[in-house]
């Protein structure tokens, strides 16, 4: 029978910690981009043409970056779930007798 175990216990625990931090950080960044934080203007991919029609184009770019942050947070959440499954499989492996 094929085993789904592909990570050791330390790597799985590290994956959980990094995923938790990534989810928290990216959700906060997504919220800050969604409220159009002026501090994050350097991270918005705008051109000179975007400044011609008022702030609405810049606001749309802020929201696009915000959605990208939320999507990345979702991917980190999936990675954290995978790492959690690996931790559970490693614990189950400890109790199995060969």
UniProtKB/Swiss-Prot annotation:
Its main location: membrane. Pfam families: V-ATPase_su_f. It is an enzyme of class 3 (hydrolase). It is a multi-pass membrane protein. The chain crosses the membrane at residues 13-33, 65-85. Its EC number is 3.1.-.-. The keyword Membrane applies. Keywords: Cytoplasmic vesicle, Endocytosis, Endonuclease, Hydrogen ion transport, Hydrolase, Ion transport, Membrane, Nuclease, Transmembrane, Transmembrane helix, Transport. GO terms for molecular function: RNA endonuclease activity. It is found in: Endomembrane system; Cytoplasmic vesicle, Clathrin-coated vesicle membrane. GO terms for cellular component: clathrin-coated vesicle membrane; endomembrane system; vacuolar proton-transporting V-type ATPase, V0 domain. Signal peptide: none annotated. Coiled coil: none annotated. GO terms for biological process: endosomal lumen acidification; proton transmembrane transport; receptor-mediated endocytosis; receptor-mediated endocytosis of virus by host cell. Belongs to the RNase K family. Endoribonuclease which preferentially cleaves ApU and ApG phosphodiester bonds. Hydrolyzes UpU bonds at a lower rate. Regulates the activity of vacuolar (H+)-ATPase (V-ATPase) which is responsible for acidifying and maintaining the pH of intracellular compartments. Required at an early stage of receptor-mediated endocytosis. Interacts with the proton translocation complex V0 of the V-ATPase. Interacts with ATP6AP1. This is Ribonuclease kappa. It comes from Mus musculus (Mouse). The lineage of its organism: Eukaryota, Metazoa, Chordata, Craniata, Vertebrata. The gene is Rnasek.
